[in-house]
Amino acid sequence: MNFYPFHIGDYISHTSHLSNEEDLAYRRLIDLYYQTETPFRKNLTFLARRIKSTEETVALILVEFFEETEEGWRNKRADEEIAKYH
């Protein structure tokens, strides 16, 4: 996807507790998720390098905002938007 809806109020209410580094990692992970339209593989090193963050930060964000499945890490809201797109 080249575009996805961004709801500022929802974003702020769900992420206001994050540090600047965590906030940036979350935004980059969401952007990457929409760009690839697939669950993230379970490889913290790969994801951290892709978004220029640390494995520790990526792990914190994945646990809080994504769901670990057999297919990899999924984001429910992004999956719903991607399904609407197709």
How does the language model describe each region?
Residues 1-86:
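Detector for short helical micro-motifs
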